Curated annotation (Swiss-Prot):
This is Ketol-acid reductoisomerase (NADP(+)). Coiled coil: none annotated. InterPro entries: 6-PGluconate_DH-like_C_sf, KARI, KARI_C, KARI_N, KARI_prok, NAD(P)-bd_dom_sf. Residues 183-328 form the KARI C-terminal knotted domain. Mg(2+) 2 binds at D191, E227, E231. PANTHER family: KETOL-ACID REDUCTOISOMERASE, MITOCHONDRIAL. It comes from the Bacteria. NADP(+) binds at Y25, G26, S27, Q28, S51, S53, D83, Q84, V85, Q86, G134. It comes from Kocuria rhizophila (strain ATCC 9341 / DSM 348 / NBRC 103217 / DC2201). Mg(2+) 1 binds at D191, E195. Its cofactor is Mg(2+). One of its GO terms (cellular component) is cytosol.
């Protein structure tokens, strides 16, 4: 059984007696910074010169400086820049500003697990990873609740790294919901697998194929969109509330029977075998190497794949429908998925 920590297991004064630098001010960065500030923690933001996020951070009353300055001032540095730039940011602006007794934190273990970042001796390396997007982390904190976090320690140079990480998690509201102890390896590999095989890659392509099957059979695109994409949220919400069992209990007998007899025809044992291949590529560093090499060469493959997927007919249909119905988001930037970029 996983070890789970709550409010009574964490001492907020530990992080309150440290100086924290949040490197990056995107989806997670703004939530961490604001929650820590509201928890009485000394926080500053480290950003690249000319960053578009500077004005947003300053508007919240946060102290903003260069990444190097923030790393030099602070003794806890949370790196929340995108995975593909973390190693460069670390080498250019953070590494030489670390001192014995400092700690570097991450919200995802990618760069530590695959060896792109190696901390000097005497520096704690830990992870505090909220299991939710930044706007949810902030909203739940303001409501007096929290989002579950993962916590891990890779290097415990001080002998107090876990307590420091738990204190940080308490500062952003994680211990209100529960903080699960893990390792950098477990978090990184399982997170990448979940994204690629189920949550993002698996789900996206399942939805696209479902849309194609219906429209190619002559059904209206708008009807197909509702049946294979829009209603997906209703099903996922039920799963989150009570597992697959509650989802099956909540739907009609017709739908439940169809789940049992037709689901295995689509997702058969061969899919599981291919999922195991995906996991193997992650574990052996094949995916990480491919991703980082592509990013280093200008992200050519990444951009080509993104452009191709954006042209799928379900996107055109979805944009049209979302603009017509009052129950949808009015913030077009958020609706189209660019708010955190």
């Amino acid at each position: 059984m996983a070890k789970i920590y709550y409010n009574d297991d964490a001492d907020l004064s530990i992080i309150q007696n440290r100086s924290v630098a949040i490197i990056g001010y995107g989806s997670q960065g703004h939530a961490h910074a604001l929650n820590l500030r509201d928890s009485g923690v000394d926080v500053r933001i480290g950003l690249n010169e000319g960053s578009k996020s500077r004005a947003k951070a300053e508007a919240e009353g946060l102290q903003v400086m260069s990444i190097a300055e923030a790393a030099k001032e602070a003794d806890v540095i949370m790196i929340l820049t995108p995975d593909q730039v973390q190693a460069q940011v670390y080498e250019e602006s953070i590494k030489d500003n670390l001192e014995e007794g400092d700690a570097i934190f991450f919200a995802h273990g990618f760069n530590i697990r695959f060896g792109y970042i190696e901390a000097p001796q005497g520096v704690d390396v830990a992870m505090v990873a909220p299991k939710g997007p930044g706007h949810t982390v902030r909203r739940e904190f303001e409501a007096g609740r929290g989002v579950p976090d993962l916590v891990a320690v890779e290097v415990d140079a001080s002998g107090n790294a876990l307590q420091l990480a738990l204190s940080y998690a308490k500062g952003i509201g994680g211990t209100r919901a529960g903080v699960i102890e893990t390792t950098f390896t477990e978090e990184t590999e399982s997170d990448l697998f979940g994204e690629q095989a189920v949550l993002c890659g698996g789900m996206s392509h399942l939805v696209q194929y479902g849309f194609e099957v219906l429209t190619e059979a002559g059904y209206q695109p708008e009807i197909a969109y509702f049946e294979v994409l829009h209603e997906l949220k209703l099903i996922v919400d039920l799963m989150v509330e009570g597992g697959i069992a509650k989802q099956r209990w909540s739907i009609s007998d017709t739908a439940e029977y169809g789940d049992y007899v037709s689901g295995p025809r689509v997702i058969d044992p061969s899919v599981k075998e291919r999922m195991q291949d995906v996991l193997k590529d992650i574990q052996e560093g094949v995916f990480a190497d491919r991703f980082m090499k592509d990013q280093a060469s200008g992200a050519k493959e990444f951009k080509e794949l993104r452009a191709k997927e954006e042209k799928h007919p379900i996107e055109t249909t979805g944009r049209k429908l979302r603009s017509l119905f009052a129950w949808e988001q009015t913030d077009a930037d958020y609706t189209e998925g660019t708010a955190a970029r």
